Curated annotation (Swiss-Prot):
PROSITE patterns attached to this UniProt entry: DHODEHASE_1 (PS00911), DHODEHASE_2 (PS00912)
Tagged with keyword Repressor: no
Disulfide bridge partners, by residue number: none
Keyword Hydrolase among record annotations: no
EC number: 1.3.5.2
Name of the coding gene: pyrD
Pfam families membership: DHO_dh (PF01180)
Superkingdom of origin organism: Bacteria
Pathway: Pyrimidine metabolism; UMP biosynthesis via de novo pathway; orotate from (S)-dihydroorotate (quinone route): step 1/1
Organism expressing this protein natively: Helicobacter pylori (strain P12)
Subunit architecture: Monomer.
Protein name: Dihydroorotate dehydrogenase (quinone)
Cofactor(s) listed: FMN
Length: 351
């Protein structure tokens, strides 16, 4: 009831203005362990059936918040309290940048979807690291999503990723290389096997922490499989599928720029993930994101081969109860099918 009133107010505002107001509140809450514990007591959910050890990290549950919500690692404590099993901060770039011109964030309410053309707006790696350390330690694993600065030419992209990774080496539990945002000109061109190979070979020499590649949903299947194979061969520990889509046919009234996320992406993301899992299940940790908004969809992705999940748009539309609702219902679905834990259900459809 309370969130429905708050949502009505927030949805009367420009989408980015609303997000900024929420961020201010969450940052304030993150400064208070007492308030975070209060949130956790109301909206958190813990069940040993949902716990898992992946890549040496303990995940209280498989449901994470995708990168883009907390761009500067300034409200992670509060977000964890809403029931997430892990979070991904960023996208951080080597240097601070403003991103694209506003308006750049839009709602497609009937489709429960978002369209964003943000352009990696963030305070830069130095301030992101400072903020992360200020609020540490954290109760769940935290990933750091890394991107390329807009002004960096393609020929120097590898150096730029090396620079931002180097600044972030002392924070986070894993790193995700974002080559798939549609909002940085030509960034998706880096989704090729040669660059991906160079990128992960470079990163493996710099850190022993897990490394992930986040891919776009708009790749041709053969291209996607080739790129992922290159990443895994070069040392990637996991693949996150997928980022936002540029397929404007998925909503009734799309804006000219920006990637789409939310329920409009459910089918497309699921189909991409299915192909990914058929080829690489048991070879890599697979993370499914895109259009997940309830336990049924979450469970389907897990049975398809997802060790972990991420949400974003559904959190905007459904509010603070979402994690708790998904996780409670997920436990029921596991029990109904005779699984003793979520770990047993991963890849069940492939066995």
């Amino acid at each position: 009831m309370l969130y429905s009133l708050l949502k009505k107010y927030l949805f009367s505002l420009d989408a980015e203005d609303a997000h900024e107001k929420v961020c201010k509140i969450l940052k304030m809450l993150s400064s208070s362990p007492f308030l975070c514990n209060l949130i956790d007591s109301q909206w958190g959910y813990k069940n040993p059936k949902l716990e898992n050890e992946i890549l040496g990290l303990h995940f209280p549950n498989p449901l994470g918040l995708a990168a883009g919500f907390d761009k500067n690692a300034s409200m992670l404590r509060a977000l964890i309290a809403f029931g997430f099993g892990y979070l991904e901060a960023g996208t951080l770039t080597n240097e601070a940048q403003m991103g694209n011109e506003r308006p750049r964030l839009f709602r497609h309410i009937e489709e429960e979807s978002l369209q964003n053309a943000m352009g990696f707006n963030n305070h830069g790696a130095v301030l992101g690291v400072r903020s992360f350390k200020h609020f540490a330690p954290y109760k769940t694993p935290i990933g750091i999503n890394l991107g390329k600065n807009k002004h960096i030419e393609q020929a120097h992209a590898l150096e730029d990723y090396k620079a931002v990774l180097n600044k972030c080496l002392n924070i986070g539990d894993y790193y995700t290389f974002n080559l798939s945002s549609p909002n940085t000109p030509n960034l998706r061109d880096l989704q090729n096997k040669a660059f991906v190979n160079e990128l992960f070979c470079m990163a493996k020499e710099m850190t022993h922490k897990p490394l992930f590649l986040k891919i776009a949903p708009d790749l041709e299947t053969d291209d996607m499989l080739e790129i992922v194979n290159s990443a895994i061969g070069a040392g990637a520990h996991g693949i996150i599928a997928t980022n936002t889509t540029i397929d404007k046919s998925l909503v009734f009234a799309p804006k000219e720029m920006g990637g789409l996320s939310g329920k409009c992406l459910t089918k497309k993301s699921r189909e991409i993930f299915k192909e990914l899992a058929k080829a690489f299940f048991n070879q890599s940790v697979l993370v499914s994101v895109g259009g997940i908004s309830d336990a049924k969809e979450a469970y389907e992705r897990i049975k398809m081969g997802a060790s972990l999940l991420q949400i974003y748009s559904a959190f905007i539309y459904n509010g603070p109860n979402l994690c708790q609702n998904i996780l409670k219902d997920l436990v029921k679905l596991l029990q109904k099918d005779g699984f003793l834990s979520v770990k047993e259900a991963i890849g069940a459809d492939l066995r």
